[in-house]
Amino acid sequence: MEKNISRRIRFEQALKLGDEFGVTRQELTKRVLKKEKYEVYTLFQINVVANWGSTGRIAEEIGQMAIKCGWKSYIAYGRGKPKSQSKLIRIGNKVDMYRHALISRLLDNHGLNSNKATRKLIDRIRDIKPDIVHLHNIHGYFLNYALLFDFLKDAGIPIVWTLHDCWTFTGHCAHFIFIGCDKWKVGCKHCPQKLSYPTSWLCDRSHRNYKIKKMVYTSIPNLILVPVSDWLAGLLRFSFMKEYSIRRIYNGVDLMTFSPQGNTLQLRRRIGVIQRYMLIGVASVWSARKGLADFVALRRKLSIQEYAMVLIGLTQKQIQELPQGIVGISRTNSVKELAEYYSVANVFVNPTWEDNFPTTNLEALACDTPVITYQTGGSIEAIDEKTGIIVPTGDVEILTQSVRQICEDRIIEEGQCRKRAIELYNKNDRYKEYMSLYNELMNSLHK
């Protein structure tokens, strides 16, 4: 009896949400009766991590939205010990991952190992019979993409693939803007980033990898690509994936968590910036590509008496090497504390040389903090003239001028950044776009 009541409540929730996603109650009821259960469809996501890091959280929250809409949700992942509202499936184990990484470093064949783990995954997919398979990052030493796609090409399951970087259509690297490489457009070889992720110590098989990826990925008849920025969508149209349908869906943020924090005076006192303008920079890993050297150069241009500078996400070694006038903070696990740092800052500076669509820009906007970014990849798409400034990549002089414009001239009106975040980057709105896409695919199959 209790189970039936629970099912009825979930079904009523699915009907209510179904209205939002363009699925009529008649159609939804028909699907329920056809399957004789209240979980209307089954979503199966694959990502290197689950409920951790940016891509892991995105997969988790898409799964949560699917569950709210009456779907069953599975997430298959490669590493970690996550908790999830979805049903989790671990792909392989640590030993398998280390073996995959070692072979990849020796033979430059990243993504072509983990055979046994991938076959077990395929068996689980066969057993579960999902209605949608949603791929995220399938690189990271945990999966054999050739085996997986050989199964998917004949499985008849609609495939959605969210692209968070460029690894899919290159012969080796995940990013190439920093070094200005265009070999991926015609066929990679003599890779200038052989020692970058995924590192290869000995071989350069980028040309072979490129050909294998092209053959494997273009074998799928029912694939929709979902880049998370217009910039990445533009690159796809020059890649060997250009014939596939492309649907850009931006990432979003939790607007309840990332919001203007009221009492920031205590934080300012703690870091000693009560009467100064404050710049903030945030990264999960700081490197030259993320603009660490640019922050050091910017520090020399701005008066220490007038401007405080705080960088979050540094290693202890990096903190020790910082010049005077930069406060270094290691990675914070408290999202509330991170929101406080965004809120207390006068401007969020993101001098990234290579990025797809950085979530940090969105988090800053949600806390009503203006953003300055280099003219890099999809980073510029987060802002407009009312919410920030775009600076030519590497131009520290203009970067300095932009900081002064926002802090001293106050060219950004209070409330505009938060308004843009609400209108464009509410994570629930973005996940509803995924649900609409899923329902489009399901409706097309039932016509």
Features from the language model and the residues they span:
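Aromatic "clamp/platform" in nucleotide-sugar-dependent glycosyltransferases that forms part
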Residues: W353
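Short hydrophobic beta-strand element within catalytic cores of glycosyltransferases
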Residues: P370-T373
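Nucleotide-activated donor-binding/catalytic signature segment of Leloir-type glycosyltransferases, i.e.
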Residues: G313-K336
